[in-house]
């Protein structure tokens, strides 16, 4: 699972800020009647929706090698497929596939991701920034307010 073993704290929709820390699922499917084209998941639209929820930096996990970037915030690409990383190493930031090949363990790759997040937050450019990826898309979607049952109890 891309989310690891963390407990899911709640569900939010684009533009909602999580009320507490923890792992949230982002509901990107528009509310209302089913319309042609939805769900039409687009990596760049989902990155913009995460930023609308308050994300300043995006850790983007990929196995196929999506070459997304962002016009607004840095995108760090963590690739879990060693072959994809080798083929797209100029555009991928972290080779998490080393774990599958026995060249690194989970803690080592975790430290690499943490160190890269800190470096990018302090001004180092991610690979997509170095390559000039400045994609942006904001799909038209309509969302109803989320109910309290989807959020953690905050005292």
Question: What residue spans do the PLM features occupy?
Answer:
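Anaerobic metallocofactor- and corrinoid-dependent redox/one-carbon enzyme cores
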Residues: 1-155
């Amino acid at each position: 699972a891309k989310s690891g073993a963390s407990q899911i704290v709640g569900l939010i929709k684009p533009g909602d800020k999580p009320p507490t820390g923890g792992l949230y699922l982002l509901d990107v499917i528009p509310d209302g009647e089913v319309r042609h084209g939805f769900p039409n998941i687009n990596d760049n639209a989902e990155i913009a929706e995460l930023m609308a929820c308050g994300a300043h930096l995006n850790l983007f996990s990929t196995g196929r090698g999506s070459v997304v970037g962002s016009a607004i915030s840095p995108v760090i690409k963590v690739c879990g497929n060693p072959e994809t990383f080798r083929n797209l190493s100029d555009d991928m930031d972290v080779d998490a596939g080393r774990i599958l090949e026995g060249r690194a363990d989970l803690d080592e790759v975790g430290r690499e991701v943490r160190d890269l997040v800190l470096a990018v937050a302090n001004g180092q450019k991610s690979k997509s920034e170095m390559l000039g990826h400045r994609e942006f898309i904001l799909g038209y979607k309509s969302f109803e307010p989320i109910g309290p049952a989807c959020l953690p109890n905050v005292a």
